[in-house]
UniProtKB/Swiss-Prot annotation:
Ranges that cross the membrane: none
Name used for this protein in its record: Large ribosomal subunit protein uL11
Annotated InterPro entries: Ribosomal_uL11 (IPR000911), Ribosomal_uL11_bac-typ (IPR006519), Ribosomal_uL11_C (IPR020783), Ribosomal_uL11_C_sf (IPR036769), Ribosomal_uL11_N (IPR020784), Ribosomal_uL11_N_sf (IPR036796)
Quaternary data: Part of the ribosomal stalk of the 50S ribosomal subunit. Interacts with L10 and the large rRNA to form the base of the stalk. L10 forms an elongated spine to which L12 dimers bind in a sequential fashion forming a multimeric L10(L12)X complex.
Post-translational modification: One or more lysine residues are methylated.
GO molecular function: large ribosomal subunit rRNA binding; structural constituent of ribosome
Function: Forms part of the ribosomal stalk which helps the ribosome interact with GTP-bound translation factors.
One GO term of the biological process aspect: translation
């Protein structure tokens, strides 16, 4: 018989840097999960993606065991890394903060494909370009 799901916890944690401090500790502590067990497993799984923020969905079962799925980093994080900026524009319609080549947008879209509900890389590119526009990043050919 399958285990009964008690709770789903969604977090965004820097790769390889999960620790029992907030936000990880309180979120998992409420569910009664072994926090150190999760932190060690997450850090081992994401150590090759250092510097990126990794979304994770943790499924907690009634017997307090858990499984988790790591997703691809958010498009905004990948765009900031590609453009070499710390944060997006506060006024994206007036103030542009960086430019990114279309090739780089394609690369980001291909990275994000498993998590996007896009039929092709071209539609995924449009989604990434929309994120870039809302951050004040200009896309050039």
């Amino acid at each position: 018989m399958a285990k009964k799901v008690m709770k789903l916890v969604k977090l965004q944690i820097p790769a390889g840097k999960a620790n029992p401090a907030p936000p990880v500790g309180p979120a998992l502590g409420q569910a009664g999960v072994n926090i150190m067990g999760f932190c060690k497993e997450f850090n081992a799984r994401t150590q090759d993606q250092a510097g990126l923020i990794i979304p994770v969905v943790i499924t907690v079962f009634e017997d307090r065991s858990f499984t988790f799925i790591t997703k691809t980093p958010p498009a905004a994080v990948l765009l900031k890394k590609a453009a070499g900026i710390e944060s997006g524009s506060g006024e994206p319609n007036r103030k542009k903060v960086a430019t990114v080549k279309r090739d780089k947008v394609r690369e980001i879209a291909e990275t994000k494909m498993p998590d996007l509900n896009a039929a092709s890389v071209e539609t995924a590119m449009l989604m990434v370009e929309g994120t870039a526009r809302s951050m004040g990043i200009v896309i050039e050919d």
